[in-house]
Amino acid sequence: MTPGASEAALEALSVRLGLPLAFDDDACSVMVGEQPFAIRRDGPGDRLVVSAIVADDLPDAPSRKLVEDLLNLGFGLMHDGLPAVARDPETGFIAAFAIFAGDRLIAPEFPDAFEKFAAFAQRLTDRLDAERSGYSADSDGGAGEASAADPAGFDIIHV
C-alpha cells in the first residue's frame, strides 16, 4: 500500500459515483439513494472505516433468527473489508461498518467494495424494517435472507 491510498480510494469512489468527495477532518459523508454513509480515515497508516446507520434501534421483539444473524456479523471484524454491526449504547442506533486496509484499499477496487457494502447495508436496513413491522425471518424461513453466494459478495454474511 502506498502513502495516500485512502485519498486515492476516495477519488476512485468519487469518479464511480460521479460526486465530488473529499475528506474533511479525516471524514467524508456520501448519500447513496436514501442511505447516508460515513467514510473516515482511521488509525496509523492508510485505513478507511465505512459505516451506515441501518436502524434507529432494534425491533421491540426481535426474532431469534435476527439476533443470531446480528451476532454472527461480529465475525466480520476478523476479516479485512467484511461488514460488522454494532449498537450505539447512547443513541440505540444500529450501525453497519467495514474496515478497509491493505489490498482492500487499492483505488481501482475500493468502489466495488463500497458498492458491496452499500448493498449489504440496504439489505440489513430492509431486514430490520421487516422485523419492526412484524415480518420475522423465523416465521417463514427468511425475510430478506441472502444465500451464501449473495449478490453483495459477502459470502459469510447471511442477512
Give the ranges of each region predicted by the language model.
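A mid-sequence interfacial segment
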Residues: 84-116
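Short, internal acidic amphipathic alpha-helical interface segments
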Residues: 53-97
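A contiguous, mid-protein "functional segment" used to position or interact
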Residues: 104-137
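Hydrophobic residues embedded in beta-strands of well-ordered beta-sheets
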Residues: 28, 46-48, 92-94
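A short acidic-to-branched-hydrophobic micro-motif
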Residues: 41, 45-56
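Charge-rich, low-complexity N-terminal segments
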Residues: 1-38, 78, 86
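Short, highly charged C-terminal tails/helix-capping segments
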Residues: 129-159
